[in-house]
């Protein structure tokens, strides 16, 4: 029998959270996802794992024992992109949090992870987040939350998401999301200058075909050319646009097989784009999962 922590995944999407927990050394033993496109992705990558399709009809007794429940309930009613139309937890989609909480109450896993858009924190003037935190607290969980951004975890994107970790009967949740001061303070003199790293990186990069998309490009200087687009050392770099000409790597996987004109883009595979848009930043999830493992050994073993 495996000694790995077991994970039950809800609102699984295409399995980004599941992958992050597997990368950290845990075992996913259950998934629940309603969209058929995402179900097909899950079946391809986790063919042996039980997959339920509708959380609203899911009975707690049908979920195998799991140490960790993970899931990001639908964000449409919470997202700032729907400003003026946000129904919050009263909405039919984001209101599925209550069903998730019901399953947590009945099965009482040691750990709970909730991922959602930052809009969860201020929806209904903060009342929706208060409901989420209070609900978990009343179920006996210690609750911690933090907004994390994918750009600080080695990915070339700004993807800010709110993460809520809850630990049953212990204060372990806070230790998962927040580092002790000693772990977060570094000796600046020990760091290599970024321009040195940039020079040394060239030989390690793989060969690839490229073509021109912008003349100025991204220079190694803090500012370069009339657009002033140099590399930044305080966050994600500037985005190349389509004016002029410079270098872009040709990759079938990165471009979904074809580079198109704006007229064609509207006819692309919307299911794939929607699934990617709803996905999580896996390195962030893996970081959280690894810290759950450490805290679990401390508080539950």
Q: Residue spans of the language-model regions?
A:
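Short glycine- and Lys/Arg-enriched binding-loop motifs that mark or flank ligand-binding interfaces
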Residues: 9-12, 67-68, 91, 115, ...
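Short coil/turn residues that cap or connect secondary-structure elements
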Residues: 121-124, 140, 280, 284
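Basic/polar N-terminal segments that are highly enriched at the extreme N-terminus
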Residues: 1-3, 300-301
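Class I SAM-dependent DNA methyltransferase catalytic core
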Residues: 145-152, 157-301
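Conserved S-adenosyl-L-methionine
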Residues: 52-54, 118, 140-152
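Charged, glycine-enriched surface loops/patches
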Residues: 125-149, 167-170
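Conserved hydrophobic/aromatic pocket- or pore-lining residues that grip, position, or stack substrates
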Residues: 13, 141, 240
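Core alpha/beta nucleotide-donor-binding catalytic domains of modification enzymes
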Residues: 2-111, 117-130, 134-137
């Amino acid at each position: 029998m495996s000694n790995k922590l077991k994970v039950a995944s809800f609102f699984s999407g295409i399995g980004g959270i599941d992958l992050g927990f597997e990368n950290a050394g845990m075992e996913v033993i259950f998934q629940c996802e309603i969209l058929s496109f995402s179900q097909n992705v899950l079946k391809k990558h986790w063919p042996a794992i039980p997959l339920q399709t509708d959380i609203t009809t899911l009975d707690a007794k049908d979920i195998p024992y799991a140490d960790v429940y993970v899931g990001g309930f639908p964000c449409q009613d919470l997202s700032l992109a729907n400003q003026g139309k946000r129904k919050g937890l009263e909405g039919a989609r984001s209101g599925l949090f209550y069903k998730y909480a019901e399953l947590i109450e009945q099965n009482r896993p040691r750990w709970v992870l909730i991922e959602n858009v930052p809009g969860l924190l201020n929806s209904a003037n903060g009342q929706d987040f208060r409901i989420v935190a209070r609900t978990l607290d009343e179920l006996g969980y210690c609750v911690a939350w933090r907004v994390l951004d994918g750009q600080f975890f080695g990915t070339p994107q700004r993807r800010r998401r709110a993460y809520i970790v809850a630990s049953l009967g212990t204060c372990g949740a806070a230790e998962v999301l927040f580092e002790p001061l000693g772990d977060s303070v570094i000796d600046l003199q020990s760091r290599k200058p970024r321009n040195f790293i940039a020079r040394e990186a060239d030989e390690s990069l793989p060969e690839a075909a490229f073509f021109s998309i912008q003349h100025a490009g991204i220079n190694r200087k803090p500012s370069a050319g009339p657009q002033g687009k140099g590399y930044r050392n305080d966050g994600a770099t500037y985005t190349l646009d389509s004016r002029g000409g410079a270098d872009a790597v040709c990759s079938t996987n990165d471009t979904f097989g074809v580079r198109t004109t704006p007229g064609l883009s509207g006819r692309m595979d919307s299911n794939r784009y929607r699934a990617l848009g709803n996905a999580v930043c896996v390195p962030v999830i893996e970081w959280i999962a690894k810290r759950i493992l450490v805290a679990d050994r401390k508080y539950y073993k």
